[in-house]
């Protein structure tokens, strides 16, 4: 072996296993503006110190492996390694800690959510030293977020396209979600749109099944949109689900939607994958299509409080990957969602600059540097009695989506849509007049129902419906 080779590969190398904290726990590190910062909820195995567990997360999600390797000498570990720079105990929880990890920007491919997640959460969650691990939040630096296109259009461009301002948008998921023929499906779409809704929606698992192939559904839904627009004088849309088994098929469906003149398509971004979603978002911007995002499968990832990933991280990732709408819970309906935490990630979707606020689960200040915003969609077990609370909680820049709360109306789809539109307009007018929606909401709905028989019928049907489990 030549002396030169010894210097590169052998000198200073000592085989064996050493504690991660000796290399990856760096409490004196000052984070850089270009670092991606992560907050992990760490539950170590019994006997594993918190510092070692935090350092293990930093190591296994960046440059580390289980043993010392001689090839470490061929690069600069100090430049590329992740660093656990702070650990704090979680108040009220035994043996749980928040570990803060800083990742150098060079570890990540530009414009790739796929690569970012593969690095940060791809392997470390199965690590034996950890009983459980949850990614609570990420700080995406402008140096990285500017490598992404983001949403195809954003909130303001969507409002301009639709010519609708000063109120939340109204939607409806067509039910039953599976089993209708394409023509009957289109009829249901038409009735909802002519009744006053802005959008109707394919459910997440409506793709191209034997009872209703995608092309037939797209054609009948386009016919319904044009007919409803002609009758109401308003711009309408239906979320045509382009999700498919391959990216090529997905784009083919989006192309056909554009050829029909549809204003919006839809994608299941978690089951479809971030690479597919980003590809579709780029196509939508280039071709003037809005993109509605469904979060099917999210609860598999985010529901456990000590393991997985909080939805605020998935929401940030979606804003980077691209989408104009995303489902965000309701706070008041059938699906789980705590108010302050929900509003925290709603702000992360819509706003340009969001301050750190631990009471709302926001661990880092996030600057999106003018990346377009995403409309949060409230959907799941909501009806007309929820309208005041939804209007107050989500504000104007949102989509309120009533599936059963429209199609379950005793008089049919169109009266169900009328009831929702009247309830929304009443709440917006009351709010603009200075009334308190949280305190006077039921009274506002009753007043409106006195002159709207459709709303009165809806109020009677759902007056006692609650989801308390």
UniProtKB/Swiss-Prot annotation:
Which enzyme class, named as a word?
lyase
Q: What is its main location?
A: plastid
The answer to whether keyword Acetylation applies is yes
Which is an annotated Pfam family here? RuBisCO_large_N
Q: Which residues carry this modification: N6-carboxylysine?
A: 201
This protein's UniProt keywords: Acetylation, Calvin cycle, Carbon dioxide fixation, Chloroplast, Disulfide bond, Lyase, Magnesium, Metal-binding, Methylation, Monooxygenase, Oxidoreductase, Photorespiration, Photosynthesis, Plastid
- Give the UniProt record's GO annotations in the biological process aspect: photorespiration; reductive pentose-phosphate cycle
Q: What PTM annotation applies here?
A: The disulfide bond which can form in the large chain dimeric partners within the hexadecamer appears to be associated with oxidative stress and protein turnover.
Q: Where is the active site?
A: 175 (proton acceptor), 294 (proton acceptor)
Q: How is the cofactor bound?
A: Binds 1 Mg(2+) ion per subunit.
Q: Which residues bind Mg(2+)?
A: 201, 203-204
Q: Which family does it belong to?
A: Belongs to the RuBisCO large chain family. Type I subfamily.
Q: What is this protein called?
A: Ribulose bisphosphate carboxylase large chain
**Gene name for this UniProt entry:** rbcL
